[in-house]
Amino acid sequence: MYPFMTLNDNTEIVHSETLDDGTVKVYIEKPDEKDCFHHMTVYLPSYKITEVTGFTDEEVKKYMDIIKSKAHLIIQFAAEGD
C-alpha cells in the first residue's frame, strides 16, 4: 500500500498498485480513542465499498467525495507504483 493523503483529522488514505483485475484498492483509516481505528475499503474505478467499520454515513459520504475527486490521481499513481 502506498500513502496518498493525510487529512486534517488524521485520516490516512492509502492505495494499492493496480491489481491484476485492473482495480485499485483504496483504504481509509482514522484513529479513534475509543475503538482504536475506524476504516473502510473502496475499489476503483467502480467506487465499490467492501468494508466500513466505525464511520458514520456522513463520514463515508465525505470520504467518498474526496476519493471521487481524486480518483484519477490515485489510479495514475497506482499504475506507476507510487
Regions inferred by a protein language model and the residue ranges of each:
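Residue-identity detector for glycine
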Residues: N8-D9, G22, G54, G81
